[in-house]
Amino acid sequence: MVAMLLLQAAIYAHPEQLVDTVWVAAHASDAGVRVVDMRQSGYAAGHVPGAVYLSPVAIRDAKAPPTFLPTPAAFEEMMAKLGIADATRVIVYDERGGIYAARLWWILHYFGHDNVALMNGGWTKWAAESRATSTDSPSPPAAKFTARPHPEMVATASDVVASINRPGVKIVDARTAAEIDGRDLRGIKRGGFIESSVPVYWEDLLDPQAKTFKSADEIRKIYQDRGVLPSQQVIAYCQVGMRASVDLFALHLIGYSNLRNYYGAWEEWGNRDDTPIATKK
């Protein structure tokens, strides 16, 4: 019984959301599976065989502040062109530890498509293992994708203001210490952090060498040491919604369920004059 409890504590609550390179190598060409390459560059020079390409900037609508989320119609068209249908198993990877891949993972969940996973370790691990690559660009037949938005997954600035120091809600900051301290503004008008938020830098969730996600126990300890508990609603933020998506992915992976992305993020919060900002004393 003790051994069983230890085993349950060590595994992810949603292991289907994270697949390894061995699985991808064996199933990338399966009917019903679509691998999506979300690297900034390098697709034409070589990618996972069968993978289609989606630019990281394609899923950010510059005309739709403060969230910059694509419209349901635009996202449906985008997925349809990639050959992603309602029943498609989507596997996403990038070369940046998952910040682009996790963003698509989160947006797919937002639009009601839960059958999506990250390739653990991304392109870094695939290349390190000298796995097969291709320079072919697949042209999958257009598919029928239905966007079913879940607005409850997005926290607005007003939601965040109402959540500051609120029992039962924890705000998680996925940014660097320099951003939180206000030393690295990154073009934002004001520096600092949201009062009562706790820092969980997104890269701390990864093995520093392999860039694979840490074990369930390690991830759970990172959050619980900062007072982030499964019973709470968690609102994550960064600067533009990418790094926060990695935190939300990790939390979902270990079984947290009440998760929201403040998608306006520090780009909105730090550029407004009416949002409260805390600074390091």
Task: Show where each model-derived region lies.
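Cytosolic catalytic domains that perform sulfur/thiol-centered chemistry
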Residues: 7-281
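Sec-dependent signal peptide recognition
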Residues: 1-7
